[in-house]
Every structure is written in C-alpha cells, then in structure tokens.
Design a protein with these regions (language model features):
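Long, low-complexity, charge-biased intrinsically disordered regions
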Residues: 1-260
Length: 260
C-alpha cells in the first residue's frame, strides 16, 4: 500500500504547484479481482439463509449443490487485495500512467508543466493530485469501469476525506497555499478512550536510554485494560502521528515499542 511518506510528498507538491486534490474510494473494489483459472479451485459452502429466501443451490443437471466454486475474488479471501491491485494497476496503465520506482503504489503521468497527475493507491482508496484537465479526464476514465463509494470525495467545499483524514487546501490572503490535515473522528475516539487528562501525570523527556517499561509498584500501579486500553490509545496516536501530527510521532513510537 501507499506509504505515508509518499502521501506527504504528494500534498507538498499540491502546495508548491497549487494543484487540485481529489480522493476516490472504490466501491466493492475486491469484488473486481478475477481468479486465475489455472490456480487450484476455491470451494465455498452456500451462504446461510438461502433456504429462507427460497433459493436452493443447484447444479446444471438439477441436482442439489453442496458447495460453490469461486470464479472471482470476494471479501475475506486472503489474496483478494492482491488480485484487485493487479487488475487496478493494469487499468491505471491504460490511462497512460507509469508506476513510480520509489513507491510501487504511486502512479504518474506528465504531459507538460501544466498538465500532470499523481495517483496514490492505498488499497481501495485513491489520493489524486494534478493540474490541468488530466484530473477530470481520469475521473471520467475511472467511471467507465469502477464505481465511487457514496462516502468518498468532497466532504465539504474544499475538504476531501482520505483514509479518515480531512485534507483542506486553501490560499491565504497573502497568496500562500497551505494544507490543513485533521481527523475529528479519530480525535473524538481518543477522547472517549482517554477521558479527562489525569492531573498527576508527570512530563518526562524521551532521551536516549530512558526506561519506559518500569515494573509495577505502589507508586506505579498496574491499570486494567478495561479501565484504560493503552494499546488502542497508542494505536490511534501512532496513526495520528504518522498521518498529520508529526510532532508527537517519535514519542508515541517510543512508548508503543515498550508495550508488552
């Protein structure tokens, strides 16, 4: 999948060149992958509830079917993502896009300095940065085969959602292009998990060699995960740190690495 460093690079280029930013979430992406007929067949039990719907699985000769053979990828199949990306990458190359040697999930096409496009693929999510008519042309090309999810794209005027991150590009009164990244849902979840900040917390500098996994004692009591789910908290913090809160990423990574 697309690395977060590549995502930041794409957003920096959008700032430098005042380029358009779009986000597309592919609807039912994994269902578009096709299984190779030469691979061993994948047998499936008929889904529960077919009898209640009045549907009885049958073979071509009319006998009752006790299993199905999958012909295309489905959600839950281990290689569904791989099959989808193989098909989708072929689709991207059909638009004249080339695969980056730096990040295989970054695709680009440059016609000239005023017409270029970058497409970052993160599973079934696409981040698009470009100038000129190529962005519109690609969206029309995309609609010819795939369908966009209803909850993807522009959330509010000028604000696009990508991987749960709100991306807003704006121009200041001095003509400076800036991008704001935020995620109200993740921050709301963090507040629900953490509650009010305890008053007895002590700030410590994360210097080299500091011991973070201090054994439990009277002064350092062990707190149940039912009271405070530390793993979930630092999972959200790490995502926030890698995606847009770069200032707290180092601290979160150091603490998360000491969790056992």
């Amino acid at each position: 999948t697309l690395s977060l460093d590549t995502i930041r690079l794409m957003l920096v280029l959008a700032c430098l060149h005042d380029a358009d930013i779009q986000a597309i979430d592919v609807s039912g992406a994994y269902l578009s992958g096709k299984l190779d007929p030469s691979d061993p067949p994948i047998f499936m039990r008929p889904p529960a509830g077919l009898d209640e719907m009045g549907v009885e699985p049958k073979l071509p000769n009319g006998e009752k079917a006790y299993c199905y053979v999958a012909k295309s990828a489905i959600y839950g199949l281990q290689k569904a993502c791989k099959l989808y990306l193989k098909s989708y990458f072929k689709f991207l190359s059909g638009f004249g896009l080339k695969q980056s040697s730096i990040d295989p999930c970054l695709w680009y096409r440059v016609d000239d300095s005023k017409n270029w496009i970058l497409i970052g693929v993160y599973s079934d999510d696409n981040l698009i940065v470009g100038k000129g008519n190529l962005v519109k042309e690609f969206k029309a090309y995309f609609d010819s085969k795939y369908q966009e999810s209803p909850d993807s794209g522009e959330v509010n005027p000028g604000i696009h959602k990508f991987l749960g991150i709100m991306v807003e590009k704006r121009k200041t009164r001095h003509g400076i292009i800036e991008i704001e990244l935020s995620s109200p849902k993740i921050m709301k979840k963090l507040r629900e998990l953490c509650g009010d900040t305890p008053r007895h917390l002590v700030k410590n500098q994360l210097v080299e060699g500091i011991a973070l996994n201090v054994p439990p004692s009277e002064d350092n009591p062990l707190i149940s995960e039912k009271v405070f789910n530390c793993r979930s908290v630092f999972g959200f913090c790490l995502w926030a740190g890698m995606a847009w809160r770069f200032d707290c990423h180092y601290g979160c990574a150091r603490i998360a690495s000491s969790l056992s």
